[in-house]
A protein has these predicted regions:
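Short, flexible, basic/aromatic active-site loop/helix in glycosyltransferases
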Residues: 132-171
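Active-site-adjacent helix/loop segment of glycosyltransferases
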Residues: 207-282
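N-proximal low-complexity "stem/linker" segments adjacent to membrane-targeting elements
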Residues: 1-24, 288-290, 340-341, 387, ...
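Short, acidic, metal-binding catalytic loop of nucleotide-sugar glycosyltransferases
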Residues: 21-31, 314-315
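A conserved acidic beta->alpha catalytic loop
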Residues: 22, 38-46, 63
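Glycine-rich, basic loop-to-helix element that forms the pyrophosphate-binding segment
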Residues: 60-78, 99
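Conserved donor NDP-sugar-binding/catalytic core segment of glycosyltransferases
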Residues: 91-127
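Short aromatic/hydrophobic "clamp" motif used to bind/position activated sugar donors
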Residues: 83
């Protein structure tokens, strides 16, 4: 078997459903298996997914064991030459799956590969490639220097934005949202460190792969990852959890550094955590309703009718345009010359009318200002955006 896809799920059944649908398209020519470990979800994930995807191997945990242990449970059963650690809130493409396999087949020194992750507005997610968080690199990241000087090879090394994102490059740290690992390399390094409950485990594994003499690569192959939109990285909870993981990594791999060197790191960690906490208090005092979306909807007549009902209910003050089309009739989608994007902020694609690969390609090549992506399927009857899932069945019952 060539590939084992491993997904850890926790209460995101609709995003997972879409991820699995994209995998069906992406792996049709690859011998593979898909293993989903459910961390005791309470949203009915088990019943919902297993009835729709009977070929997926479903492992239901009795409690939330965290991301690392969830993946390790699947690693122990995986049979593929390559292992793809994949987040459920992603859309993958045939280009990404087959491109990574082809690259690793021809580069035997590659331990793991990462890809070009898109945000829902089509922009590049900087966490697609990262450098090892050495004491200095970590300090620059946590103090904000890397944000002030993103292109600097000295201060902005964490996200490596000085590298050409359209070219394959050796990097150090690969995101656990999409990490294709050589099974042989994982056997040599050992599985994920379960002390990392959430965040940091991908950094630790990437580093251990490098220490075994392998190389890690970034490949300019597109996938979409919703996390960049749906996770507020300025909240106290996120900052505390993430930087606590950084502390664990620092203690594990740089314990030989003196207290005087580690002190600035800890100051930066807690400084960012305090700022996030204070900022969060101000945000809670001034909660504003999100403005209505202005949508271009492209798809079949059936999908247009259903999405129209959802938008009339949820974004009734927005301006919406509906275009009956598919990939064969209108391959340029929302980028067609006949469509003006000036008044719109969101494009909704019918995933039965356009392949996921085409949707991401169009999203990534949008000229001028960015358009946020939403998807709809008449099979699931769910409108999925970066921050919400709208159920047509709920809307139709209210009518």
């Amino acid at each position: 078997m060539k590939l084992s896809v491993i997904i850890v799920n926790y209460n995101v059944k609709y995003y997972l459903e879409q991820c699995l649908n994209s995998l069906e398209q992406a792996t049709e020519d690859v011998s593979h298996e898909i293993i989903v470990v459910d961390n005791a979800s309470t949203d009915g994930s088990t019943e919902y997914i297993t009835t729709r995807f009977p070929d997926v191997r479903w492992i239901a945990s009795k409690k939330n064991n965290g991301f690392s242990k969830g993946n390790n449970i699947a690693f122990a059963q995986a049979k593929g030459e390559y292992l793809l650690m994949l987040n459920p809130d992603t859309i993958v493409t045939k280009e990404a799956i087959e491109g990574c396999i082809t690259f690793m087949d021809s580069h035997n020194d590659t331990g793991a590969c990462g890809v070009y992750m898109l945000r829902t507005d089509g922009s590049f997610a900087p966490e697609s490639r990262r450098a090892l968080p050495t004491p200095f690199v970590a300090f620059c990241k946590m103090s904000g220097l890397s944000t002030l000087f993103p292109k600097s090879r000295t201060f902005g090394r964490y996200y490596m934005q000085y590298l050409d994102k359209e070219k394959e490059n050796p990097i150090e740290i690969i995101s656990g949202a999409y990490m294709m690992i050589r099974h042989k390399a994982l056997k040599e390094t050992g599985p994920l460190d379960e002390d990392f409950f959430m965040y940091g485990e991908d950094i630790d594994l990437s580093y251990r792969i490098l220490k075994k003499g392998y190389k890690n690569y970034f490949l300019p192959l597109r996938i979409l990852h919703y996390k960049g939109e749906s996770t507020n990285k300025s909240t106290y909870r996120y900052v505390h959890t993430f930087y606590r993981a950084m502390q664990l990594f620092f203690k594990k791999h740089y314990s030989h550094y003196s207290f005087l060197i580690s002190l600035p790191i800890n100051v930066a960690i807690w400084g960012r955590a305090i700022l996030a906490y204070v900022g969060n208090q101000f945000r809670h005092r001034k909660i504003q309703e999100k403005p209505a979306k202005n949508c271009i909807v492209i798809g079949s007549a059936e999908s247009i009718a259903q999405v129209s009902d959802i938008l009339c209910e949820k974004h009734k003050n927005g301006k919406h345009t509906f275009i009956e089309a598919n990939e064969a009739i209108m391959p340029q989608g929302h980028l067609s010359d006949s469509i003006s994007l000036e008044e719109y902020d969101t494009v909704v694609y019918d995933t039965n009318a356009y392949t996921y690969g085409t949707i991401l390609k169009l999203l990534n090549t949008a000229p001028g200002r960015r358009m946020n992506l939403a998807t709809y399927s008449t099979e699931s009857q769910k409108l999925i955006t970066g921050d919400n899932v709208y159920d047509y069945c709920d809307i139709s019952k209210e009518k």
